[in-house]
Amino acid sequence: MSMTDLLHAEDIKKAVGAFTAVDSFDHKKFFQMVGLKKKSPEDVKKVFHILDKDKSGFIEEEELGFILKGFSPDARDLSVKETKTLLAAGDKDGDGKIGADEFSTLVAES
């Protein structure tokens, strides 16, 4: 399954394009723009599993830095600052990574 099976390619393009400037990434706006906010909990979990590149059941800090690439291969990497901000927003239990339930909560709060 690919991201475009779950989200509209045009929405992905617009959302990724809105945050091309370094340190401009806003996960709440991004999740809304890309259409993730309107998706069912099942679809949000499917998106999580696409972003969990090493299939560990978590999106670790390193994977978070590449989150935009998970939506669009030619997107930029997040800066260290953006990655840390996103991790802090999503990591509810403080284990340094984001699990599927934490990701769902992060999207729901957007």
Curated annotation (Swiss-Prot):
SMART domains: EFh. Ca(2+) 2 binds at D91, D93, D95, K97, E102. GO terms for biological process: excitatory chemical synaptic transmission; gene expression; inhibitory chemical synaptic transmission. The keyword Glycosyltransferase does not apply. Keywords: Acetylation, Calcium, Metal-binding, Muscle protein, Phosphoprotein, Repeat. Residues 39-74, 78-110 form the EF-hand domain. The modification N-acetylserine is found at S2. It comes from the Eukaryota. InterPro entries: EF-hand-dom_pair, EF_Hand_1_Ca_BS, EF_hand_dom, Parvalbumin. GO terms for cellular component: axon; cytoplasm; synapse. Ca(2+) 1 binds at D52, D54, S56, F58, E60, E63. Coiled coil: none annotated. GO terms for molecular function: calcium ion binding. The modification Phosphoserine is found at S2, S24. AB domain, comprising of helices A and B, is involved in structural stabilization, protecting the hydrophobic core of the protein. It is required for high-affinity binding of Ca(2+) and for Mg(2+)-binding. Belongs to the parvalbumin family. In muscle, parvalbumin is thought to be involved in relaxation after contraction. It binds two calcium ions. This is Parvalbumin alpha. It comes from Bos taurus (Bovine). The lineage of its organism: Eukaryota, Metazoa, Chordata, Craniata, Vertebrata.
